[in-house]
Protein backbone atom coordinates (compact mmCIF):
# COMPACT_ATOMS: atom_id res chain seq x y z
CA UNK A 1 0.00 0.00 0.00
CA UNK A 2 1.81 3.05 -1.30
CA UNK A 3 -0.74 5.60 -2.47
CA UNK A 4 -3.84 7.43 -1.36
CA UNK A 5 -5.73 5.48 -4.01
CA UNK A 6 -4.56 2.20 -2.46
CA UNK A 7 -5.99 3.28 0.89
CA UNK A 8 -9.26 4.28 -0.78
CA UNK A 9 -9.47 0.83 -2.37
CA UNK A 10 -8.81 -0.87 0.98
CA UNK A 11 -11.62 1.10 2.63
CA UNK A 12 -13.86 0.37 -0.35
CA UNK A 13 -13.54 -3.37 0.32
CA UNK A 14 -15.30 -2.68 3.62
CA UNK A 15 -18.00 -0.57 1.97
CA UNK A 16 -16.46 2.82 2.79
CA UNK A 17 -16.53 5.35 -0.02
CA UNK A 18 -15.47 8.70 1.40
CA UNK A 19 -16.32 11.99 -0.26
CA UNK A 20 -17.10 15.18 1.66
CA UNK A 21 -15.74 17.75 -0.78
CA UNK A 22 -13.06 18.73 1.74
CA UNK A 23 -9.85 16.74 1.25
CA UNK A 24 -8.55 17.40 4.77
CA UNK A 25 -11.76 16.17 6.41
CA UNK A 26 -11.83 13.14 4.12
CA UNK A 27 -8.31 12.13 5.15
CA UNK A 28 -9.03 12.61 8.86
CA UNK A 29 -12.21 10.52 8.53
CA UNK A 30 -10.30 7.82 6.67
CA UNK A 31 -7.71 7.71 9.48
CA UNK A 32 -10.53 7.20 11.99
CA UNK A 33 -12.07 4.45 9.87
CA UNK A 34 -8.73 2.67 9.56
CA UNK A 35 -8.26 2.80 13.32
CA UNK A 36 -11.71 1.28 13.84
CA UNK A 37 -10.98 -1.49 11.34
CA UNK A 38 -7.71 -2.28 13.11
CA UNK A 39 -9.22 -2.18 16.59
CA UNK A 40 -11.95 -4.58 15.45
CA UNK A 41 -9.32 -6.96 14.02
CA UNK A 42 -10.53 -6.49 10.46
CA UNK A 43 -7.10 -5.46 9.14
CA UNK A 44 -3.59 -6.44 10.20
CA UNK A 45 -1.31 -4.13 12.15
CA UNK A 46 1.06 -3.79 9.18
CA UNK A 47 -1.81 -2.84 6.87
CA UNK A 48 -3.05 -0.27 9.35
CA UNK A 49 0.41 1.21 9.94
CA UNK A 50 1.21 1.55 6.24
CA UNK A 51 -2.20 2.97 5.32
CA UNK A 52 -2.06 5.43 8.21
CA UNK A 53 1.42 6.57 7.14
CA UNK A 54 0.18 7.16 3.59
CA UNK A 55 -2.78 9.18 4.88
CA UNK A 56 -0.66 11.24 7.29
CA UNK A 57 1.69 12.11 4.43
CA UNK A 58 -1.26 13.04 2.23
CA UNK A 59 -2.74 15.16 5.02
CA UNK A 60 0.55 17.01 5.47
CA UNK A 61 0.78 17.67 1.73
CA UNK A 62 -2.84 18.84 1.66
CA UNK A 63 -2.28 21.25 4.54
CA UNK A 64 0.93 22.58 3.00
CA UNK A 65 -0.78 23.03 -0.36
CA UNK A 66 -3.66 24.86 1.27
CA UNK A 67 -1.22 27.24 3.03
CA UNK A 68 0.62 27.80 -0.25
CA UNK A 69 -2.52 28.91 -2.07
CA UNK A 70 -3.61 31.26 0.73
CA UNK A 71 -0.65 33.46 -0.12
Curated annotation (Swiss-Prot):
Pfam families: YqgQ-like (PF06014). It comes from the Bacteria. Coiled coil: none annotated. This is Uncharacterized protein YqgQ. It comes from Bacillus subtilis (strain 168).
Amino acid sequence: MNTFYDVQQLLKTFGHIVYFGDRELEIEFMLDELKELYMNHMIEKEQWARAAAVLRKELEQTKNGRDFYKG
